Design a protein with these regions (language model features):
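Single conserved hydrophobic/aromatic residue that forms the stacking wall/gate
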Residues: 1-12
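Basic, alpha-helical terminal appendages of large translation-related enzymes
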Residues: 149-185
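Hydrophobic/aromatic-lined pockets within catalytic cores
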Residues: 10-13, 37-44, 88, 92-93, ...
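Short, mixed-charge aromatic SLiMs
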Residues: 27-31, 109-117, 171-184
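Catalytic adenosine-cofactor/nucleotide-binding cores of aminoacyl-tRNA synthetases and other
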Residues: 51-133, 140-143, 152, 156, ...
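Catalytic cores of enzymes that engage adenine nucleotides and/or redox cofactors via long glycine-rich
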Residues: 13-78
Length: 185
C-alpha cells in the first residue's frame, strides 16, 4: 500500500552513494530503485550507484553459499587496516580481485615503502600538480590503480626533485592518503 511505501522514506534516507556487488545490479538494485522512487515521491534515492567486482579465492567467487568467506577483521589484525585498504585500492573497484595472503604481503611491502616516504612530514596539500593528478584519477571512475602508478612513478624519481619539491610532494602524498582513509600514527 502506498502509505507503507511512503513510510520507507522516513526510515531510509536518501544517499549520496549506494554500493553493492555487481551481482546485485539485477534484480536487487533495480527493485530497490523502483521501491525507493515511491518512498521518496519520485526523488532520487541515491546520486551514485557503485557496483564492485567480486572477490575471488582460488579463482572462485567468495560467497556464503560457497562457504569460502574470509573475515576482514582477521586480516586487519594480521596486516593492519592500512595494508588491507591498500590491497583493495591496487585494483579497479569494478573488476574482480583475487584474494591471497601473498597479495596481502605484497601490498604490505608496497605500503611500507609509501610509509617511509611520508613518515616524517605533516599532511598538507602543497603540491597542486599532484592534487590535480589525484583528482583526475578519482574523476576517472575512481581509478585508484592509475593513481597508485603515478604515486610510485614519482617516488622512484624523488631524488630528481629539489628539496622544496620533495617536501611538498611528501606532504601532499600524506594529505591524499588521509583523504583515502589511511592513518599515520
Amino acid at each position: 500500500d502506498n502509505r507503507r511505501s511512503r513510510g520507507l522514506g522516513d526510515v531510509y534516507k536518501r544517499q549520496d552513494i549506494h554500493c553493492g556487488g555487481n551481482d546485485l545490479i539485477f534484480p536487487h538494485h533495480e527493485n530497490e530503485l523502483a521501491q525507493s522512487e515511491t518512498a521518496f515521491e519520485n526523488q532520487q534515492f541515491a546520486k551514485y550507484w557503485l557496483h564492485n567486482g567480486m572477490i575471488n579465492l582460488a579463482g572462485q567467487k567468495m560467497s556464503k553459499s560457497e562457504g569460502n568467506i574470509k573475515l576482514l577483521n582477521e586480516y586487519i589484525d594480521l596486516y593492519t587496516g592500512n595494508v588491507v585498504r591498500f590491497f583493495f585500492l591496487r585494483a579497479q573497484y569494478r573488476k574482480p580481485q583475487e584474494f591471497t595472503e601473498a597479495l596481502l604481503e605484497e601490498s604490505e611491502t608496497t605500503f611500507n615503502r609509501l610509509l617511509e616516504v611520508v613518515k616524517d612530514v605533516e599532511s598538507n596539500p602543497a603540491d597542486q600538480g599532484f592534487i590535480e593528478i589525484f583528482e583526475n584519477s578519482m574523476n576517472d571512475d575512481l581509478n585508484t590503480p592509475k593513481f597508485l602508478g603515478e604515486v610510485f612513478e614519482k617516488i622512484n624519481k624523488i631524488k630528481d626533485l629539489n628539496e622544496q619539491e620533495e617536501q611538498e610532494f611528501k606532504e601532499t602524498l600524506k594529505y591524499i592518503f588521509e583523504i583515502l582513509g589511511f592513518t599515520f600514527d
